[in-house]
């Protein structure tokens, strides 16, 4: 077993797995270090709702075999309304998806080391040259990539990670069977992915039901402990309590039962990234962070960050001098903002405003969605300041002012 590689990747999630897949396909010597054991992977990191769309499926050639259910629509709910829109998608079996990434990279020659907990970088001359794991084990490479998510042991050691606790979103998800997907008074969620804005269920966040076929669905709650959460939270409630409260009060769960062993927990940070690279090093995926701030979609963004990191590494290692300096790898930062998360500042600002709005305002938002043209909705969702401004009402001025105040003070 060699201890010198072209690239070391810490973490085998969607970002790390895709980076390994692309680099191995290009013929580089790649080593992936993954904390979990091979037999259990990914039992402790199986934390994604795993909803995605055809653009992602096609861009990364994700096979149908890892899809639980193909969906036809997306649904947005408020406390008293719902909005349907035709948007084909797919709900993945996340564990199968992550194992597929491993198989793809290994088939092209990548080496995976499971039971390998990364602890800190190996430094020479002020630059990272390798990784220490499992206490005293060492491995070296020209380029090191941190794809470990919020734990970020390498990025933190290199002072590239400023993940803030107050920007951390936490989520919990169960899988249910026996669901009633279309009771009276509710939209039909058959073959749909639904997000619900309702502070009674998810103060400062959202809840979801993703149909996974038959009478089964993924059901979860996610929120940030933000201004919206502080203003609307129920005293003493944990995130588990909110999910239980929802499932006990919503008729869609009247005859539903949790599927044993199908519980997922996780967290991600909803904030602007800082610098993402330095000499011989890049941080990708939720280490950065990368999840879409508005709707929480992470698979596409993380895989794209892995892909642009792989492209950056390919460029640096193809150079006859193998230039992996900070100035060369800074191309990754540029590609991230151009291709992974364009207009991320606008989407973050819109997200912070959204979660400060009241339940009554959520009902009015859905009224607007029913009457506004698709072109305006697409532009607003894409982060267009003009389209976003045109959706504001007079009552939103106080939310705009408070969000702007906090935005610039932080």
Curated annotation (Swiss-Prot):
<comment type="function">
    <text>Is involved in the reduction of 2,3-digeranylgeranylglycerophospholipids (unsaturated archaeols) into 2,3-diphytanylglycerophospholipids (saturated archaeols) in the biosynthesis of archaeal membrane lipids. Can fully reduce the unsaturated isoprenoid side chains of membrane phospholipids and glycolipids. Is also able to reduce the omega-position isoprene of dolichol phosphate.</text>
</comment>
<dbReference type="InterPro" id="IPR054884">
    <property type="entry name" value="Dggglyphlred_Halo"/>
</dbReference>
<keyword id="KW-0444">Lipid biosynthesis</keyword>
<feature type="binding site">
    <location>
        <position position="379"/>
    </location>
    <ligand>
        <name>a 2,3-bis-O-(geranylgeranyl)-sn-glycerol 1-phospholipid</name>
    </ligand>
</feature>
<dbReference type="GO" id="GO:0008654">
    <property type="term" value="P:phospholipid biosynthetic process"/>
</dbReference>
<keyword id="KW-0594">Phospholipid biosynthesis</keyword>
<dbReference type="InterPro" id="IPR036188">
    <property type="entry name" value="FAD/NAD-bd_sf"/>
</dbReference>
<feature type="binding site">
    <location>
        <position position="298"/>
    </location>
    <ligand>
        <name>FAD</name>
    </ligand>
</feature>
<keyword id="KW-0274">FAD</keyword>
<dbReference type="Pfam" id="PF22578">
    <property type="entry name" value="GGR_cat"/>
</dbReference>
<dbReference type="InterPro" id="IPR050407">
    <property type="entry name" value="Geranylgeranyl_reductase"/>
</dbReference>
<feature type="binding site">
    <location>
        <position position="343"/>
    </location>
    <ligand>
        <name>a 2,3-bis-O-(geranylgeranyl)-sn-glycerol 1-phospholipid</name>
    </ligand>
</feature>
<feature type="binding site">
    <location>
        <position position="118"/>
    </location>
    <ligand>
        <name>FAD</name>
    </ligand>
</feature>
<feature type="binding site">
    <location>
        <position position="34"/>
    </location>
    <ligand>
        <name>FAD</name>
    </ligand>
</feature>
<keyword id="KW-0285">Flavoprotein</keyword>
<keyword id="KW-1208">Phospholipid metabolism</keyword>
<feature type="binding site">
    <location>
        <position position="286"/>
    </location>
    <ligand>
        <name>FAD</name>
    </ligand>
</feature>
<feature type="binding site">
    <location>
        <position position="299"/>
    </location>
    <ligand>
        <name>FAD</name>
    </ligand>
</feature>
<keyword id="KW-0560">Oxidoreductase</keyword>
<feature type="binding site">
    <location>
        <position position="15"/>
    </location>
    <ligand>
        <name>FAD</name>
    </ligand>
</feature>
<keyword id="KW-0443">Lipid metabolism</keyword>
<comment type="similarity">
    <text>Belongs to the geranylgeranyl reductase family. DGGGPL reductase subfamily.</text>
</comment>
<protein>
    <recommendedName>
        <fullName>Digeranylgeranylglycerophospholipid reductase</fullName>
        <ecNumber>1.3.-.-</ecNumber>
    </recommendedName>
</protein>
<dbReference type="InterPro" id="IPR054715">
    <property type="entry name" value="GGR_cat"/>
</dbReference>
<dbReference type="GO" id="GO:0016491">
    <property type="term" value="F:oxidoreductase activity"/>
</dbReference>
<dbReference type="GO" id="GO:0006650">
    <property type="term" value="P:glycerophospholipid metabolic process"/>
</dbReference>
<dbReference type="Pfam" id="PF12831">
    <property type="entry name" value="FAD_oxidored"/>
</dbReference>
<comment type="pathway">
    <text>Membrane lipid metabolism; glycerophospholipid metabolism.</text>
</comment>
């Amino acid at each position: 077993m060699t201890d010198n590689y072209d690239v070391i990747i810490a973490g085998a999630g969607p970002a790390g797995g895709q980076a390994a897949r692309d680099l191995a396909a290009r013929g580089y010597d790649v080593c992936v270090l993954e904390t979990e054991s091979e037999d259990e992977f990914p039992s402790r990191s199986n934390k994604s709702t795993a909803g995605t769309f055809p653009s992602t499926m096609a861009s990364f050639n994700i096979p149908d075999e890892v899809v639980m259910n193909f969906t036809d629509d997306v649904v947005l709910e408020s406390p008293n309304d719902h909005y349907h829109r035709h948007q084909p998608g797919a709900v993945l079996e996340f564990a199968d998806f992550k194992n597929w990434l491993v198989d793809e990279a290994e088939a092209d020659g990548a080496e995976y080391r499971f039971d390998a907990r990364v602890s800190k970088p190996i430094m020479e001359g002020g630059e990272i040259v390798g990784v220490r794991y499992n206490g005293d084990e060492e491995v070296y490479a020209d380029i090191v990539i941190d794809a470990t998510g919020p734990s970020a042991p390498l990025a933190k050691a290199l002072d590239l990670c400023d993940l803030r606790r107050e920007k951390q979103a936490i989520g919990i998800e169960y899988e249910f069977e026996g669901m009633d997907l279309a009771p009276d008074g509710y939209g039909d969620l058959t073959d749909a992915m639904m997000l619900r804005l309702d502070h009674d269920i998810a103060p400062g966040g959202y809840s979801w039901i993703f149909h996974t076929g038959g009478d089964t669905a993924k059901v979860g709650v996610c929120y940030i402990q933000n201004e919206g959460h502080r203003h609307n939270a129920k005293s003493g409630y944990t995130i588990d309590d909110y999910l239980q409260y929802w499932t006990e009060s919503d008729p869609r769960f009247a005859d539903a039962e949790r599927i044993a062993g199908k519980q997922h927990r996780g967290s991600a940070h909803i904030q602007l990234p800082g610098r993402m690279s330095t000499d011989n090093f890049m941080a990708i995926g939720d280490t950065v962070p990368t999840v879409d701030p508005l709707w929480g979609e992470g698979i596409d963004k993380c895989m794209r960050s892995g892909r642009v990191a792989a492209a950056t590494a390919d460029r640096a290692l193809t150079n006859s001098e193998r230039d992996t300096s900070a100035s060369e790898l800074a191309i990754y930062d540029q590609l991230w903002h151009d291709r992974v998360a364009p207009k991320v500042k606008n989407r973050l600002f819109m997200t912070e405003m959204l979660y400060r709005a009241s339940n009554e305002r959520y009902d009015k938002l859905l009224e607007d969605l029913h009457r506004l043209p698709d072109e305006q909705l697409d532009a607003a969702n894409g982060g267009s300041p003009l389209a976003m401004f045109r959706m504001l009402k007079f009552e939103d001025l106080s939310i705009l002012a408070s969000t702007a105040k906090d935005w610039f003070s932080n």
